[in-house]
């Protein structure tokens, strides 16, 4: 039986895969697993969401599940995912729930749960919650024991004060175009950047519940690239639907991805003495160019599986201070327990202001090798890599690349696909090898 929880919570098409009934059951199960009876105070869970239309329905269902188990729901409304994680700690809540499908299209939605302190749950805890969903509720409280719903009007201000601490140098000399993806960053990001002194121009910051991630945000950079050049801005920043990602665009309209952002921040943090053990944590999807840049700088790279939860686990295990993903999830444990796109944007602009260098100049140490990624639909993503014909195709590709590139096969954590990624000295070679391996994978259908 497939796990209920994927790499980033429970996701699916809202009202088909992720129904109100399932959301209620998840709220109830999380309340039973994560809240502890016998508190001197009432048990509390923070609940937030992104602005997609189905969020209102799922929020109501989750809150019904929580309150039915005697847990008060502290409703913070539309806020970034990292804000919900932070507020779970700041309000000393038992746990937090974020309703969002991040960068996914509008019809999708998801539920991710943060434990005490705003930390993501481990697999064992998620599996126990899934078991409780299957079991259904037990005896429920009545009367005064039923949970209450409380709104938190200061939630956004508390989060903005928190991320504002990341600003080491005022940003008054910088003009930034911000693509908010019609998502949870639409209110928070412009306020945070303006509070730090930046001249902020916004695009895609008018959420109506239906337009989230629609041709905009960190998965559609073209509009932002054009806007930065058109306005003559110093840089652009793109967030996704729940603002846990940040990608950038330099003044020339060139995309600065998560790998390049990590290089900039790692070098800055080592200079300031903040880079613990002179180590950066990245995933297997990070470009070989990142590894080469860090090698040249004398910085070690610790590699994890794909997913910011695995980056977080490695950061905590090694007490490291910076990690992230090529997609723009950047984690700084001293400031947060999960990827925070707005925090990343502030740190990046602070570095520009401090050094008085352009983003292009700061990102110069990162030389990205051409990378080709092909998603192949398969019947069983867990067994494809063991097929002899696939192993043979991979071995041939590795022999052709030698030490000038690399190949990676991995099953998606959220879809029934296998991702074939090849990096090489030139794009033609990368594409040819990726296509050959992808064809061998597709034959396993």
UniProtKB/Swiss-Prot annotation:
Q: Can you cite an annotated GO cellular component? A: cytosol
Superkingdom of origin organism:
Bacteria
Residues bearing Phosphoserine are 102
Binding positions for Mg(2+) per the UniProt entry: 102, 240, 242, 244
InterPro entries, A to Z:
A-D-PHexomutase_a/b/a-I, A-D-PHexomutase_a/b/a-I/II/III, A-D-PHexomutase_a/b/a-II, A-D-PHexomutase_a/b/a-III, A-D-PHexomutase_C, A-D-PHexomutase_C_sf, A-D-PHexomutase_CS, Alpha-D-phosphohexomutase_SF
Keyword set for this entry? Isomerase, Magnesium, Metal-binding, Phosphoprotein
| Catalytic reaction equation(s) | alpha-D-glucosamine 1-phosphate = D-glucosamine 6-phosphate
Instruction: Provide a GO biological process annotation.
Output: carbohydrate metabolic process
Q: Does the keyword Metal-binding apply?
A: yes
MF GO annotations? magnesium ion binding; phosphoglucosamine mutase activity; phosphomannomutase activity
Post-translational changes noted in the entry: Activated by phosphorylation.
Which residues participate directly in catalysis?
A: 102
Please give the cofactor(s) recorded in the UniProt entry for this protein. Mg(2+)
Instruction: Give the EC class as a word.
Output: isomerase
Instruction: Tell me its EC number(s), please.
Output: 5.4.2.10
What residue range is the signal peptide?
Answer: none
> Which free-text remark accompanies the cofactor?
Binds 1 Mg(2+) ion per subunit.
Sequence similarity: Belongs to the phosphohexose mutase family.
Q: What does this protein do?
A: Catalyzes the conversion of glucosamine-6-phosphate to glucosamine-1-phosphate.
Protein name, as recorded: Phosphoglucosamine mutase
């Amino acid at each position: 039986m497939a796990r209920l929880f994927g790499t980033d919570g429970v996701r699916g098409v809202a009202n088909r895969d992720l129904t109100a009934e399932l959301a209620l059951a998840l709220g109830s199960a999380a309340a039973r697993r994560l809240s502890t009876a016998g508190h001197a105070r009432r048990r509390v869970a923070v609940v937030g969401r992104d602005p997609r239309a189905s969020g209102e329905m799922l929020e109501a269902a989750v809150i019904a599940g929580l309150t039915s188990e005697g847990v008060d729901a502290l409703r913070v409304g539309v806020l970034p995912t990292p804000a919900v994680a932070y507020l779970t700690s700041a309000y000393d809540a038992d746990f937090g729930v974020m309703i969002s499908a991040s960068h996914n299209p509008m019809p999708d939605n998801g539920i991710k749960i943060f434990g005490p302190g705003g930390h993501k749950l481990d697999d064992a805890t998620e599996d126990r919650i899934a078991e409780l969903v299957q079991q259904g509720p037990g005896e429920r409280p009545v009367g005064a024991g039923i949970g209450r719903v409380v709104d938190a009007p200061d939630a956004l201000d508390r989060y903005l004060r928190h991320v504002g601490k990341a600003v080491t140098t005022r940003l008054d000399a910088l003009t930034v175009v911000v693509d908010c993806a019609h998502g949870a960053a639409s209110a928070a990001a412009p306020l945070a950047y303006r509070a730090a002194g930046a001249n902020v121009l916004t695009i895609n910051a008018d959420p109506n519940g239906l337009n989230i991630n629609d041709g905009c945000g960190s998965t559609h950079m073209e509009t932002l690239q054009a806007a930065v050049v058109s306005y003559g801005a110093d840089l652009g920043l793109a967030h996704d639907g729940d603002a846990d990602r940040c990608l950038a665009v330099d003044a020339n309209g060139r995309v600065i991805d998560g790998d390049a952002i990590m290089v900039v921040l790692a070098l800055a943090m080592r200079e300031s003495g903040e880079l613990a053990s002179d180590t950066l944590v990245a995933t297997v999807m990070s470009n070989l160019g990142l590894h080469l840049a860090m090698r040249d700088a004398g910085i070690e790279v610790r590699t994890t599986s794909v997913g910011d939860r695995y980056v977080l686990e490695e950061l905590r295990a090694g007490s490291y201070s910076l990690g992230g993903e090529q997609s723009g999830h950047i984690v700084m444990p001293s400031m947060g327990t999960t990827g925070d796109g707005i925090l990343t944007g502030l740190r990046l602009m602070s570095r520009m202001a401090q050094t008085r260098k352009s983003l292009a100049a700061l990102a110069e140490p990162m030389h990205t090798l051409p990378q080709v990624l092909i998603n192949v639909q398969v019947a069983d993503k867990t067994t494809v890599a063991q097929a002899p014909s696939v192993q043979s195709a991979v071995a041939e590709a590795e022999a052709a690349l030698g030490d000038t590139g690399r190949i990676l096969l991995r099953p998606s954590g959220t879809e029934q696909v296998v991702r074939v990624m090849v990096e090489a000295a030139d794009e033609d070679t990368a594409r040819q090898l990726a296509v050959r391996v992808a064809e061998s994978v597709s034959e396993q259908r």
